[in-house]
Amino acid sequence: MELFYHGTSALFKTFDMAHVLEGDGKAKFGYGIYVTEAYTSAAHYAYNKKRPENKSYYVYTLEIPDMTADNHLFSCRPVHPSIIQRTEKALGEQIPAEATTVGKYFRKYVGNKLTGKEGTIKKLISCADLDAEKSAAKFFCEIGLEYFAWPQAQTNPDGPTNRVVLNIDKIHIVRIDKVELDPKRFQLIEGSEEEVSLDSF
């Protein structure tokens, strides 16, 4: 298991997919629960631009499954051959090589195919609507993937990652901290972390 963090302005004991789009309302890196390796990033993400009236900010420390070579799609790396094989077997068709060059193309291509989208390969790998993202997340979870992953800094692809967890049943909440953010840039105010007991709400 790995320790990751999730920032939110909501207090809860379990994750619920019904609330997935209540953060920024986007699925830019896929559909699921967004987590990060950096506590300070999670704190920053706790500020909800869609609900600025929420003034309580929380960072959840989570245990999530270990990332292995063939249980995730990485946004800017080639897709593992095992994932391509499992996908082709489940879909009953061969995936074009262009769609396997990086994980984000593969995710979008599969989501678009699952939702009946048509067009050029370039179109199918470059954008996906919310229905396609939801379909891709469900499909990849069913064939054994745990994550969609991408680097926190695009300039450092081998550095810390952010991830989308596909199966909420694999997330274990270890700790919840209430944190304070500076009101201008919404960055963590160091030393403001205060643990919230799971029994207190």
Segments and roles (model prediction):
Residues G32:
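Active-site rim elements
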Residues M1-K28, T36, A46-F201:
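Active-site and NAD+-binding cores of ADP-ribose-processing enzymes
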Residues S41-A42:
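A generic structural signal for short hydrophobic patches within well-formed alpha-helices
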